[in-house]
Amino acid sequence: RSGGESPTAKSASGLYRSGDGGANWTEVTAASNKGFPEKPFGRIAVTVAPSNSNIVYAFVESTDSALFRSDDGGKTWDKRDKSQLMVWRPFYFASLIVDPKNPERLFKPDLGLIQSLDGGKSFANVGGGTHGDSHVVWIDPGDTQHVYVGDDGGLWQSFDGGNKWWKQNNLPVSQFYHVSLDGADPFHVYGGLQDNACWVGDSAYPGGIANAQWENMCGGDGFFMFADPADQDYIYAETQGGAIIRVNRHTHEARDIQPRAGYNEKLRWNWNTPLELSPNEKGTLYMGAQFLFRTRDHGQSWDRISPDLTTNDPQKQKQEESGGVTVDN
């Protein structure tokens, strides 16, 4: 929980415990609850084992982020795991799911999906074959080897506790950041997907449009994507951090055409960098870092056509002093 808007405001996050069904609450602290960490805290994930309500797990973002376990309903705590698998981006990946029948088995969605079979002492990746960035897990209470995981790639299920995974391909859950069309008849659709690359597909196809009619043109997080109006075999596809390629749709030959920094200079790109294609001037694109760039030769070269359009305030570029307990990667 935020302690205020100021970068110097202290976090107001905390863990609270009730012994009377929620009528009254007492904060869990390092001073009164042995083994619990010292403040300040960021995000906290807490869950109670369904088969034993005395067993509580808490993943605490702090200056020493770690997983903690209590065997007495939150009165005392034991630090369990603080490996890189556990603590990576704790402000973002912070949920715990305990097996309904086995309190020693729990999952934590993370960059992948990790699982512990020893009460949180150690974790191993069980998300092999799924997409990255897991967010939610459901364990079948009738058959705890049957598990669903939701991630940036969609929904997956396993029938053997996570050894093998099957994707549910009939769910239209992909998120487009941007789409564009070309001048073909019927026209093609171009778009970048959140954490699922850049794609081009048909707007109409005999028998209907299936997954096979979509072609992958780049990896990463897909953002802006355009077909060259003068030669629609060539596509401009952008991914995170201002990375942009010119790719031949038929040969898939690709070339990096991102504008380069000058000597002893650093360009500052947004995660989703603005990109625009001129509909009137052949081979002309515009792209924005702190400067506006223009190319008139399909990305072979770029001209800087503006001064720094940002405040370039160093005080606003310091993650370590942003008020967060941990910083982003």
What residues fall within each predicted segment?
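Beta-propeller blade termini and top-face loops
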Residues: 1-329
